Amino acid sequence: HFLTGSIIEPIENLADNLDASDSVKVYKELVPFVQTIKKQHEDIMRNATMRQEFTANVSHELKTPLTSISGYSELIESGMAADEDIVRFAAEIHKNSNRLLTLINDIIRLSELDQVEEHNCFEELDIYDIAQNCVEMLRLSAKKHDVTMELHGVHRIICANRQMMDELVYNLCDNAIRYNNPGGRVDITVDAAVAFDKTAETGATIIEVKDTGIGISKEHQERIFERFYRVDKSRSKSTGGTGLGLAIVKHIVAAHKNASLSLTSEPGKGTCIRVAFKMKTNLE
């Protein structure tokens, strides 16, 4: 009993004091076990915190347009809105309804990407063609924001999921338009990686989205791909951004083992985001 107790006691002490595990004395044979348990505990706590923050952010983001819709519709229903205001109120309801729908779609998509299976419908596709289609889809939005969009480069074949690539390029370009300045530019370039960097892997492909927008300071650059994180909240509100576009981009890149994501930016000068694809015919 004494021997059993002497073995179990440090483990029980550890279980009761996970947050102060460094101060708990254990046999040297148990040190790797303690380190593993501590890391797992930290991962669980971090994920729990992220879930709580995400839930709080979702609640806030959903509440804002719903409050606006409820307020304007109540004024119309009660007859308190003047005839000349009804059309304007209806336009606000329509705008906030669209914002709400976009937000819900993005939340659902993020949830789907969290559960994406490896090797899910990956195929060889032309990323230049996808970028070209995206530019055509967003021309009206770019014109509305007084932003010029141009596509450069050459046709390049990569191995990827087609739907995800459509979403990746769309979200990168949409973000570059929304956070640009009137009279600004968005340049999308698809080319071999060596065209950007002579030391890059031969055969690799890069898609680059570069804008002349507000830019991102150093302290914000690591967090810009987090869900609902916004550098300029007032700009997001005025442009209708959900704060989830770049989070979706990060998830899509993570789902492709042959892809990597990088960002360079300077406040007042703009942002450049690159997604690089290694030369692979499969994701093994």
Language-model region placement:
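Short alpha-helical segment of the dimerization/phosphotransfer core of two-component systems
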Residues: 95-100
